[in-house]
Amino acid sequence: MQTFAEISALREQIKTFKREGRRIAFVPTMGNLHEGHLTLVRKAREHADIVVVSIFVNPMQFDRADDLNNYPRTLEDDLSKLNGEAVELVFTPTPEMIYPEGLDKQTLVEVPGLSTMLEGASRPGHFRGVATVVTKLFNIVQPDVACFGEKDFQQLAIIRKMTTDLAMDIEIIGVPTVREMDGLAMSSRNGLLTIDERQRAPVLARTMRWISSAIRGGRDDFASIIEDASDQLRAAGLHPDEIFIRDARTLQVVNAESTQAVILMSAFLGKARLIDNQVVELVKDSKEEVDSAESESENSH
């Protein structure tokens, strides 16, 4: 396994592999790797000869300084895990390398619509930061395929559209969420939880499953479902951030044409902001316009 901090050195090595006809897969991460990340690496291995993993805590996508400062950084442990997966190349740039003129003078990439709705509405600039850094990393690595977790459902939709809109010749592969034994979605932020908080955290997934069951049972009173779900989270000591029920394909309000809905949830627990999602098939009676859906976020606080 080779580790590169310099863009030019990484590019030269990738060019060598490409001249040899090797297929390149890329897994961008922010480090503090867990089994979910390693699942992405294994999926990447299925689609390419060479796997490149980046470890970069991107300051542009954080809307709170404390969140950026608290984000766990475990480089030595990360490199050990990647070595165990026989990753060929690891890219570990500094913010100064990625943004040499600073954030204020950086050319920005933003996917209209998708970037400013749902989570993007409450975290202005977040998805612009994601799209910008992923574009830069794609340009540096020049992969044939890139793997992203489905846990970040809206982010994956944005990256898919960005790749299509900018005519990037990169196959985007979504990988299902990896969960702990108790159902909690694996996340680097889980390490911020205290022992007591960790015991309460699976309530997010359980509440999501309750919402899914309600929808599959034919309920279409989404505002009431969201209110009940928020109460369940509060009762367990979580602070609801956002709960949305949207069309899984468009992320717009569910309507008569919708065949699947996606439940998008986030909640604060201690220092951690936990997120999760689940796609659910809609029964016929649920495929109608839900006028109250636009106020879901506000109702979930």
From Swiss-Prot:
**Where is beta-alanine annotated to bind?**
Q61
This entry's Enzyme Commission designation comes to: 6.3.2.1
Binding of (R)-pantoate, residues? Q61, Q155
A Gene Ontology annotation in the biological process aspect, one of them, is: pantothenate biosynthetic process
Tell me the compartments it is located in. Answer: Cytoplasm
Q: Which reaction does it catalyse?
A: (R)-pantoate + beta-alanine + ATP = (R)-pantothenate + AMP + diphosphate + H(+)
Tell me which residues this entry annotates as catalytic: H37
Class of enzymatic activity (EC top level)? ligase
A Gene Ontology molecular-function term?
A: pantoate-beta-alanine ligase activity
Q: Which domain of life is it from?
A: Bacteria
Q: In which pathway does it act?
A: Cofactor biosynthesis; (R)-pantothenate biosynthesis; (R)-pantothenate from (R)-pantoate and beta-alanine: step 1/1
Comment field (misc) = The reaction proceeds by a bi uni uni bi ping pong mechanism.
Protein family according to the UniProt entry? Belongs to the pantothenate synthetase family.
- Subunit-level organization: Homodimer.
Task of the protein:
Catalyzes the condensation of pantoate with beta-alanine in an ATP-dependent reaction via a pantoyl-adenylate intermediate.
Protein name in the entry: Pantothenate synthetase
Organism the protein comes from: Vibrio vulnificus (strain CMCP6)
Q: What is the lineage of its organism?
A: Bacteria, Pseudomonadati, Pseudomonadota, Gammaproteobacteria, Vibrionales
